[in-house]
């Protein structure tokens, strides 16, 4: 059963070594993410699952001990998602970027609670399948916590990665309201096609969260919302 969830953005720029000179611009986001992880730790889960957007070739489950690298962003930095079980070899498949950022956040927070594993959620996964995946995750253990990585639209300004789309602000506002209030129906209703057009990579992981939270009776709280670089970022906690 899901006992707590944290929603965090997943730009590699969240990692100061990647952001370099622009690092301080996301200090507030990093601080909010750490506060959100504190809520997960306080829930004393038996299992932590980090879920984030992934492409068709790097989705699916990632066992404890999976590694991620930021070499593709010009930084010699490797992270690991939890520890592999004693006596088992380290997993060979690398984490997608979203889960690597999640693993980096857990390292920053010095997570030492429940075992951590990952799930790459294909960005085009239909909403109904996302909900079913979430329900399966919640059934994995008696006390499950989710760290849900994902960004809003990438079309908030003319300098955004997807240029300016007038629909982006409204999409992000609806998503942020749903995340901040743990509104499952509103999350499940996010338009898949519009999210794809707006490059909102968080849509599928957020709908996985909605599926996991069914019947859990969790309340939501928004800790951070902004759109630096024209991309919508939000941090929220459900407990």
What is each model feature region?
Residues 123-172:
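Active-site beta-strand/loop microenvironment that shapes enzyme catalytic pockets
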Residues 1-93:
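A short aromatic-anchored loop/beta-hairpin motif
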Residues 29-41, 45, 102, 127-134, ...:
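Short, hydrophobic/amphipathic alpha-helical packing segments
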Residues 36, 179-225:
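Polyanion-binding loop/helix "lid" in catalytic or ligand-binding cores
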Residues 229-239:
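Short, basic/aromatic-enriched C-terminal tail that caps enzymatic domains
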Residues 87-136, 142:
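Internal, conserved structured core segments that host functional sites
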Residues 162-190:
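Metal-dependent phosphoesterases centered on the DNase I-like endonuclease/exonuclease/phosphatase
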